């Protein structure tokens, strides 16, 4: 066996290289895709092995995939990102073409005009200039021109709005202005003469008199307390002879009380809603007959009524107000009556001519209180717009603008010295203004709640009385404006106050339906 295997192996000989045939590389034959072949076959209408039903079954089974030729869309967020990149390149291209001023102040002005912060933390002029360039590349250079045009238009509109408009008044107004001028000038001369005489008094004498006054004021006590009505009492006012006190109530009633025993004398019936104020005629109980008009009152329904002392019914009604009348006040002459209204105006009525001679606007909100100068030449008004105005009745001009309160002005009063004005406001303060300096000279942090009324002592103005919603009334020195006495005793808000013409009595009325008289011991 071994010998036979060896012999067989030996008999196999290796073929020479030239006899081996070379390997031929066969070319690839491309028959096309089945999908294209199938499309061609279907286009020619050939049925072949697969019919329409077989083709449909193959497509449904997923064995045959025939595309519709639609292009595969890129995802939405990828396309948005590409758009943002292109937009950023365009913005940078625009930014390079924008010319920005190298003046830093002008750059800041442009940023302010565009409503952007003029500077950022750690930003220098170069960075600020580049920031302006980037902003303009986004909003466009026309935006800066547009803001400048808008600013010019707003300036023009403000200038037009601030223009003073004059309306032609009736001839009766001209007659009244001349009459007031002739009435006030002699009184002003008399007041100045009295001031000169008072200045000639030695300083020691004046100081001792002031000390005595302060001592008596510190000894003020509640002399009488009376329940005045079933509803809150909104206003109180002494008669010129200090023998009577008039009160106004939210029930619509007005009442007259004897002083100092506080007995009810008359009940005046005529108003149907809250009465805002009732005031005595300047000559009532002094030289005026009881049958004449002695009192005037106003109410929230816009009614203003005139009263005599011998009747419980109103003598006359003043018509013309369509909204709430907050206050009424007599001119020192007694011929004119001033009313403040919630239609942003105040009015002056000539009772002798029985007509409205002045309808004065000037406040942006309702006018709440009015006061007349002792001479009769000026009128002061306080409004719910937190501003006060001083008007010259002889010319009709606003001679002083009282700006400084943060909230509504509810009380205003002139000092007998002729140049001080006090205003009480909803910001809990009382401000003292000087007509000569045309500014606020002192701010009294008077109360812990809104101040409802202010009143100077009517003879020399030696002290100032304030009342507020903190249930108290306070007395302040004049000048100096230091606190002297706090009149505490009411259980509700102090809504009104007054000082008798002789300076001996103080009256306060409250939301607790009572009024109180205060007198020195």
From Swiss-Prot:
Pfam families: PRP4, WD40. It comes from the Eukaryota. The keyword Acetylation applies. One of its GO terms (cellular component) is spliceosomal complex. Keywords: Acetylation, mRNA processing, mRNA splicing, Nucleus, Repeat, Spliceosome, WD repeat. The modification N6-acetyllysine is found at residue 26. CDD domains: WD40. SUPFAM superfamilies: PRP4-like (SSF158230), WD40 repeat-like (SSF50978). Its main location: nucleus. WD repeats lie at residues 228-267, 270-317, 320-359, 362-401, 404-443, 446-486, 489-521. SMART domains: SFM, WD40. This is U4/U6 small nuclear ribonucleoprotein Prp4. It comes from Pongo abelii (Sumatran orangutan).
């Amino acid at each position: 066996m071994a010998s036979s295997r060896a012999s067989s192996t030996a008999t196999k000989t290796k073929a020479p290289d030239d006899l081996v045939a070379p390997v031929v590389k066969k070319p690839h034959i491309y028959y096309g895709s089945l999908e294209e072949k199938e499309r061609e076959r279907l286009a020619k209408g050939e049925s072949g092995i697969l019919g329409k039903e077989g083709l449909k079954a193959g497509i449904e089974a997923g064995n045959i995939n025939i595309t519709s030729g639609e292009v595969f869309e890129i995802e939405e967020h990828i396309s948005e990102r590409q758009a943002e990149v292109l937009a950023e390149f365009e913005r940078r291209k625009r930014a390079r073409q924008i010319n920005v001023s190298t003046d830093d102040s002008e750059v800041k002005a442009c940023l302010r005009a565009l409503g952007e912060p003029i500077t950022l933390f750690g930003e220098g002029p170069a960075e600020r200039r580049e920031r302006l360039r980037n902003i303009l590349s986004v909003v466009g250079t026309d935006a800066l021109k547009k803001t400048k045009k808008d600013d010019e238009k707003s300036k023009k509109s403000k200038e037009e709005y601030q223009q003073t408009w004059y309306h032609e008044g009736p001839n009766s107004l001209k007659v009244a202005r001349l009459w007031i001028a002739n009435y006030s000038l002699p009184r002003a001369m008399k007041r100045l003469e009295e001031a000169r005489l008072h200045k000639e008094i030695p300083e020691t004498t004046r100081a001792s008199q002031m000390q005595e006054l302060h001592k008596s004021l510190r000894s003020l006590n509640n002399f009488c307390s009376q329940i005045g009505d079933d509803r809150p009492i909104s206003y109180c006012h002494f008669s010129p002879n200090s023998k009577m006190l008039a009160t106004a109530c939210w029930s619509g009633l007005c009442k007259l009380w004897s002083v100092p025993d506080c007995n009810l004398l008359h009940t005046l019936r005529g108003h149907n809603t809250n009465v805002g104020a009732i005031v005595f005629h300047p000559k009532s109980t002094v030289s005026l007959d009881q049958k004449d008009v002695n009192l005037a009152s106003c109410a929230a329904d816009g009614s203003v009524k005139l009263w005599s002392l011998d009747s419980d019914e109103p003598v006359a009604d003043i018509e013309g107000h369509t909204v709430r009348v907050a206050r009424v006040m007599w001119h020192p002459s007694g011929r004119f009556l001033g009313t403040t209204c919630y239609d942003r105006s105040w009015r002056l009525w000539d009772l002798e001519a029985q007509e409205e001679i002045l309808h004065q606007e000037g406040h942006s909100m309702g006018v709440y209180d009015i006061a007349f100068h002792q001479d009769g030449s000026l009128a002061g008004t306080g409004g719910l717009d937190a501003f006060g105005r001083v008007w010259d009745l002889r010319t009709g001009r606003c001679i002083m603008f009282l700006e400084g309160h943060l909230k509504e002005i509810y009380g205003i009063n002139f000092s007998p010295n002729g140049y001080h004005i006090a205003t009480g406001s909803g910001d809990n303060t009382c401000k003292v203004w000087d007509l000569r300096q045309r500014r606020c000279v002192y701010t009294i942090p008077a109360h812990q709640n809104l101040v409802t009324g202010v009143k100077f002592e009517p003879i020399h103005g030696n002290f100032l009385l304030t009342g507020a919603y903190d249930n108290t009334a306070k007395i302040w020195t004049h000048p100096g404006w230091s606190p002297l006495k706090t009149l505490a005793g009411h259980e509700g808000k102090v809504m009104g106050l007054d000082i008798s013409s002789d300076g001996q009595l103080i009256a306060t009325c409250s939301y607790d339906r009572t009024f109180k008289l205060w007198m020195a011991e």
